[in-house]
Amino acid sequence: MMQRISLLLVLATLTACAQDDDALLEEVRDTLPAASEVRLDVPSTDNKSTLGAVAEFYQHTRNTSDFLNAASVVWVGLIQTIMRYPATSVEGDTITWGPWNDDSALRPFAYKLVAVRTGDRSITYSLSGKRRADAGDFIPLIEGAAERPDAGERGKGTLTLLFDNQAVIDVAKRERGSIAIRYDLTGEPRTNAVTFSDFVNERGEGPRDSEYGYLQRADGSGRFDFLTLANVDEDAAGQAENLHIVSNWDATGAGRSDVAAWGGNLGEVIWNVAQCWDASFLATFTSYAATGGAQPLLANEGDAASCAVSGETVAPLL
């Protein structure tokens, strides 16, 4: 009789442990970010017909958001893919997946994902990797922390992309430095902040530090404040200029960019540009002002009354 009771107690304990493991696994899967939570949703021309040239500074806004999305969404998607597989081990509050192999013959990498519960619906996680042929240790590629108030609700958190380490396992990677992303979808509006540290892009430009701020309201309107490089003066073969761009748009996608441009071929001159676009992303108004040169410049194209949103004062980040 005692032997039977002991066996039942063992089975009950094993069942409880399995249930705890399943609950932790479900909590981690639910808490870590989905790609949609880190993506910057700038209005798109994808589903609209555009007859004419797309507004230049709308295009800079879209290109920058596309770059940031490419840098983060792919990696978040990889984490979500790994978590669809059974966990390799569960020890206390720690879950490990891996080593997990990328199935593509052209990407011979192995990954390991470790997630640790640090509080009620609070998770820290690290995705590490190495080349499958190497005998060395896994090195961190992404580190993050995530919170979600309740299952199914919108969350918040941070994740950092470590490009120096990514280049160690993938020699084709040309980016260096790090990108840290802070996202918060728990309030209105949703916000994303992105910090570049010692970042070198795929063209070898950098290293540089910069901050990006994004918000999106429930109706689809939003704001994106960012720094980029582009050749905007008349010398097509010249150096790229620094652009500080603040873009705002309404629920239809119509919007306005306020821009400060400096450096490159501009020398001591600072340009301030305001450009408005309609719901098809075609420019409806552009104003140019240049200061610091021998002759100040002020010119307007189009109708200022066509601007769907108000402008902001934007200064160069000298």
Locate predicted features.
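Short N-terminal edge-element motif at the start of the domain
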Residues: 78-176
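Sec-dependent bacterial lipoprotein signal peptides
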Residues: 1-15
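Hydrophilic extracytoplasmic domains
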Residues: 252-318
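Short acidic, glycine-rich loop/turn motifs
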Residues: 99-104, 129-133, 165, 198-203, ...
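Short helix-loop boundary/capping segments
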Residues: 141-250
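Hydrophobic residues embedded in beta-strands of well-ordered beta-sheets
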Residues: 95, 122-125, 157, 190-192, ...
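N-terminal "mature head" segments of proteins
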Residues: 17-121, 288-318
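Intrinsically disordered, low-complexity regions enriched in Ser/Pro/Gly/Gln/His and often acidic
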Residues: 68, 88-90, 242, 255, ...
